[in-house]
Curated annotation (Swiss-Prot):
It catalyses: L-seryl-tRNA(Sec) + selenophosphate + H(+) = L-selenocysteinyl-tRNA(Sec) + phosphate. Keywords: Cytoplasm, Protein biosynthesis, Pyridoxal phosphate, Selenium, Transferase. Converts seryl-tRNA(Sec) to selenocysteinyl-tRNA(Sec) required for selenoprotein biosynthesis. Its cofactor is pyridoxal 5'-phosphate. SUPFAM superfamilies: PLP-dependent transferases. It is an enzyme of class 2 (transferase). This is L-seryl-tRNA(Sec) selenium transferase. One of its GO terms (biological process) is conversion of seryl-tRNAsec to selenocys-tRNAsec.
Length: 448
């Protein structure tokens, strides 16, 4: 029997799958049939089933056509969850950017002079006012900000950093590697657990361009430890006529609840110290879109803008509009338009109400409402727990975790129980979450 002759014709398969666009279907048919021919040649395929071939091609096509990025319900309790997209954008703020994205806008056009303008002028104006800096610049993320600053001011020169701040954050982003790639010469001072201001001063040479301080994202050093304060570093930098730069990583504006402000000061306190340059992420505690926000002296920001590398880190009108709208919300103290802040500021009483609502909609669920702890996330406030409320589900924790994940609900296992943390569950997601739970319970009853 000639298996090659049993392979269905391309046009026959196309007729069976007319609901799939040809631009997707045709190459998948060709690839699948080529795999079958190869399988026949090497003896791995000994029979042909036309129906199975069509189903395989249909499945592969649907995988291409199905959206890869989908909405999930974040029930982990982590507000700034990097793997789940970090900060949410308020619908009103999104509409602000949408209007400027679906129409032409004055992105790089000076309406007064009638000629080409500066795309960074928009953000510099509002961010400088918000943060109290001389100027500001936005790039596509904080890693880009770090690279741009080092490349502009410390290329082929020395940048002094504490050994305790040579961190690695998510995605294998290592400060020493970024410094090397930027052309800056890393000078390590102090030890992992202790670095004094004298260590910085002793390391300064005629080749020193910068004293750099790095936020220790995702970890903290406690016990027998000490570090030079930002104020000390700024004072020393001014004294020695070199730059000071703080890679803050994340920044917030209003004072945070649960004593979080005691561990890290708000950006307003940092800017009062008059630093040369500061940078942080736009999608962490600031609560906006992914971006690297650079604040500092106007002459330094102007030099950054002249670096040709900035072109590679340039942000578009959507990012600029979202940052601008978020900044406006802060200026007007409309904190309810910052979902990240809303999540962090929720009281345990409010979280309990959400948990009660969920249980009222899931009468068949065996669960308890319990108090627990969670973290802000996104490398901010490492090891600083905040109170939360969870719905602790009885039963096989691993099975519940898998079943919920199949329905795009991401929770966590705590004390060998699957829990849904109400701090990160949105109010308008409660009913949908209840429907998912009820459908899982119904399936379990049918399978029993």
């Amino acid at each position: 029997m000639n298996l090659f002759r049993q392979i269905p014709k391309v046009d026959k398969i196309e007729k069976a799958l007319t609901h799939i666009p040809k631009k997707v279907l045709t190459p998948i048919i060709q690839k699948t049939l080529n795999e079958i021919r190869e399988g026949i040649k090497n003896g791995k395929i000994t029979q042909i089933n036309e129906e199975d071939i069509v189903k395989t091609i249909e499945k592969r096509s649907e995988e291409i056509l199905s959206p890869s990025i989908v909405n999930v319900i974040n029930a982990t309790g982590i507000t700034v969850h990097t793997n789940l997209g970090r900060s949410l954008i308020d619908p009103e703020i999104f509409d602000y950017a949408k209007k400027r994205s679906t129409h032409y806008c004055n992105l790089e056009y000076d309406l007064e002079k009638g000629k080409r303008g500066d795309r960074y002028h928009h953000s510099a104006k509002i961010l400088s006012h918000l943060f109290g800096s001389e100027s500001a610049l936005i790039v596509n993320n904080n890693a880009a900000a770090v690279f741009l600053i080092l490349n502009t001011f410390a290329k082929d020169k020395e940048a002094i950093v504490s050994r305790g701040e040579l961190v690695e954050i998510g995605g294998s982003f290592r400060v020493p590697e970024v410094m090397k790639a930027s052309g800056a010469k890393l000078v390590e001072v102090g030890t992992t657990n202790k670095t004094k201001i004298q260590d910085y001063e002793d390391a300064i040479t005629e080749d020193t361009a910068m004293l750099m301080k790095v936020h220790k994202s995702n970890y903290s050093i406690e016990g027998f430890s000490a570090e030079a304060s930002l104020e000390e570093i700024i004072e020393l930098a001014h004294k020695k006529n070199v730059l000071d730069y703080y890679d803050l990583g994340s920044a917030y504006i209003p004072k945070l609840p649960y004593s979080l402000t005691n561990y890290e000061p708000p950006i307003s306190e940092i800017m009062k110290l008059n630093p040369s340059l500061v940078s942080f992420s736009g999608d962490k505690l600031f609560g906006s879109v992914q971006a690297g926000i650079i604040l500092g002296k106007k002459d330094l920001i102007d030099k950054l803008k002249k670096n040709q590398i900035l072109r590679m880190f340039r942000v578009d009108k959507i990012t600029l509009s979202l940052i601008e709208a978020t900044a406006l919300a802060y200026i007007k103290e409309e904190y309810d338009k910052i979902p990240t802040l809303k999540s962090i500021f929720q009281t345990t009483e409010a979280l309990k109400e959400k948990a009660k609502k969920l249980l009222s909609l899931t009468p068949g669920l065996k669960a308890e409402i319990k108090e627990s702890h969670t973290y802000v996330g996104g490398g901010t406030m490492p090891n600083r727990k905040i109170p939360t409320v969870v719905v602790e589900i009885k039963g096989n924790a691993k099975k519940w975790e898998e079943d919920m994940r199949k329905h795009l609900v991401i929770g966590r296992i705590e004390n060998e129980k699957f829990v849904l943390d109400m701090r990160s569950v949105q109010e308008d997601e409660i009913e949908k979450l209840a429907q998912i739970i009820n459908s899982i319970i119904t399936c379990e009853v049918k399978d029993a």
